[in-house]
Regions:
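Non-heme di-metal
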Residues: 1-193
């Protein structure tokens, strides 16, 4: 059975807008990572970079569903500046929310209505990832605003992401006693293996 073409459909326009949006998010997050690094937040920088790579994969998925040729779209994208890390986290969370809570829900419905169930499903699955991105950015922002990026109310295990040194404490050391990097290189140790 021949697959239905997306040429000239709203779904085609939505896929291209999604590709452009994911590509731009990747670039913004790369810029935000550099700023976080400059401000001494290495974990936040790493998370921005990881998310940027995930956005590249989303862009790749949307691009791969297109059928070629020139397509004209009209869409709005953030035209802001790189702010401080707190501002960047807030902007990133808002962008992720718009993707999963507004755009991709609508795009999935359009794709379904136009007879593209696989594309609709891709939007639904990617929306779940974008929701997780938003939650992660909001948690990092909460820690940053409350002064809990490098502190906790209870002792936790802190790990230097440069050398692997760990210590159980309420706050990360100001400097790593093993490799000498500053506190910005510490994060709460995650056991995810």
């Amino acid at each position: 059975m021949e697959q239905k073409s997306i040429k000239g459909t709203r779904t085609e326009h939505n896929l291209l807008a999604s590709f452009a949006g994911e590509s731009q998010a990747r670039s913004r997050y790369t810029l935000f990572a550099k700023k976080a690094e400059e401000e001494g937040y290495m974990q936040i920088a790493a998370i921005f970079r990881q998310t940027a790579e995930q956005e590249l994969q989303h862009a790749r998925q949307f691009f791969g569903m297109l059928e070629g040729g020139m397509v004209e779209i009209t869409a709005s994208y953030p035209a802001g500046v790189v702010g401080d890390t707190a501002t960047n986290l807030a902007e990133a969370a808002a962008g992720e929310h718009e993707e999963w809570g507004v755009l991709y829900e609508d795009f999935a419905k359009v794709a379904q209505d136009e007879g593209f169930p696989k594309i609709a499903n891709a939007y639904k699955l990617i929306a779940k990832v974008e929701q997780m991105h938003e939650q992660r950015y909001l948690k990092l922002l909460e820690h940053l605003k409350s002064g809990m990026t490098f502190e906790d109310e209870q002792p936790v295990e802190w790990m230097c992401i440069n050398c692997g040194f760990t210590i159980m404490a309420k706050a990360a050391p100001k400097r790593c006693p093993v490799c000498g990097v500053d506190q910005g290189w510490f994060e709460r140790k995650a056991i995810n293996y």
